């Protein structure tokens, strides 16, 4: 009987590990950023994410906002900037602001992406300066 229980537990552990094989895996943290890798079946995806340090007003109730910078080597995508604000966007166009710089984004559901690759490069440059 004990042997049967051990075998069932080992099989369960195998399937649990297999089911979680494609979950994003944290690679490390640097200041307010955390980096992850993930395999979507087409290839490895690497991304960094950060969450706001401060939220206003204090009683703000919604899922946390996140800013992502993603690399998809198999699709030749690098420095793809996206954001989720924890809610569905009401409009299809979104504006991200950093200092005096404004960046146009398009949204789908609760995510938004920069429209223009040149703006992505400019936003990455702005973020590196900050």
Identify the residue ranges that each predicted region occupies:
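N-terminal secretory signal peptides that target proteins for export/translocation
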Residues: 1-2
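Sec-dependent N-terminal signal peptides
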Residues: 5-17
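A generic "folded-domain core" signal
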Residues: 21-130
């Amino acid at each position: 009987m004990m042997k049967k229980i051990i075998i069932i537990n080992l099989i369960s552990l195998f399937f649990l590990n297999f089911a979680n094989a494609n979950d994003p895996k944290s690679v490390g943290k640097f200041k307010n950023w955390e980096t992850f890798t993930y395999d979507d079946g087409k290839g490895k995806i690497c991304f960094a994410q950060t969450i706001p340090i401060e939220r206003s007003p204090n009683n703000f109730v919604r899922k946390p906002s996140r800013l992502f910078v993603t690399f998809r080597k198999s699709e030749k995508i690098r420095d793809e900037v996206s954001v989720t604000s924890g809610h569905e966007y009401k409009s299809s166009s979104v504006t991200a602001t950093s200092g005096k710089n404004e960046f146009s984004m398009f949204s789908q559901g609760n995510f938004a992406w920069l429209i223009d690759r040149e703006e992505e490069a400019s936003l990455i440059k702005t973020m590196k300066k900050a």
